[in-house]
Amino acid sequence: LREIAYKFLRETTKDADELASLQAALVAKLDELEQTLGKYPGPYFVSSFSLVDIMYSLHLDRLAANLPVYRGYHIKGNPHFPRINAYFQALAQRRAYQRVKSDDTTNNLLLRRRWGAQPVGNLLPLDLATSEEIQNRAEAAERLSDNRQAAIEDILKNSGVQALARNGDISAITQAVDFHLSLLANYLLDGNSTPLPWGRVGGKDRVDPWEAAVGAIALAYVRNRICAPRDMSAGAATAFRAAVDRVLPCIY
């Protein structure tokens, strides 16, 4: 399954017949997996969660994230694979698994960055229910606060924001980045209880466009810079990205 799946994902040909053949081979392997999951009672490979699940679960999770974005093919929610979907649902209830898995965005960003795979669609929508869970928001805020200085240095070095430096002085940029990261952390903790500073373009309470531009670059960069589980759990990463999506348009 792994070999044919990644051949399908990384294939550079645009020949429709060849891609269809690879997809058919993948579906055949998934059908075999579907049958394997039916050999024992319960949703796992054997009668209870085991080493086999530990070996295969993360791999299957990556495939479920990558295939819709890079090949337009869905495993999750596909009625052709009821046992595989029951397997994913069972894994979602295991707290330890949720601590070590990647989120869908991390899986898709890594496939493109490491292997140069070319997507055929956009990133999968974030799970809004996961993003609103208080423990995920709190963890994301904590990880951001604990690593604030490292995040600022990374943004300054790699986001391109230094191009906005005035007379080569990056101190004002550093302050603006710090301000917007704090705004993000506060939103993660407080949610909608504290209004965001939106709608200031062209109004009396006018935002400094230079500072807003720095903040926009910083947040857009860090949204896709975080990696689960390296930086935080998958649930916290989802909450982090959703918070950026909410805060970013409120900068102006």
Please give the residue ranges for each predicted region.
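Extended amphipathic alpha-helical segments with heptad-repeat/coiled-coil character used for oligomerization
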Residues: A64, V69-Y70, Y97-L128
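GST-like fold's C-terminal all-alpha helical module
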Residues: R2-Q93, E132-Y252
